[in-house]
Amino acid sequence: MKYTEIKDKTAAELATMLKEKKVLLFTLKQKLKTMQLTNPKEISQVKKDIARINTAINALR
């Protein structure tokens, strides 16, 4: 996900995307601890997506 895809969205859409990504991050961390995660790099990608969404939310303020 790129910032250019995010910056045109509304605050409500960004809030729902942020919630979804945080839930995804939680499940990925759980899978990592139970040795079910095949690609650990997914965690860092989701963290970066969360940071991009937060940046877009702060830009709207």
From Swiss-Prot:
Gene3D superfamilies: 1.10.287.310. It comes from the Bacteria. CDD domains: Ribosomal_L29_HIP. GO terms for biological process: translation. GO terms for molecular function: structural constituent of ribosome. SUPFAM superfamilies: Ribosomal protein L29 (L29p) (SSF46561). InterPro entries: Ribosomal_uL29, Ribosomal_uL29_CS, Ribosomal_uL29_sf. Signal peptide: none annotated. Disulfide bonds: none annotated. One of its GO terms (cellular component) is ribosome. Transmembrane segments: none annotated. Keywords: Ribonucleoprotein, Ribosomal protein. Belongs to the universal ribosomal protein uL29 family. NCBIfam families: L29. This is Large ribosomal subunit protein uL29. It comes from Campylobacter jejuni subsp. jejuni serotype O:2 (strain ATCC 700819 / NCTC 11168). The lineage of its organism: Bacteria, Pseudomonadati, Campylobacterota, Epsilonproteobacteria, Campylobacterales.
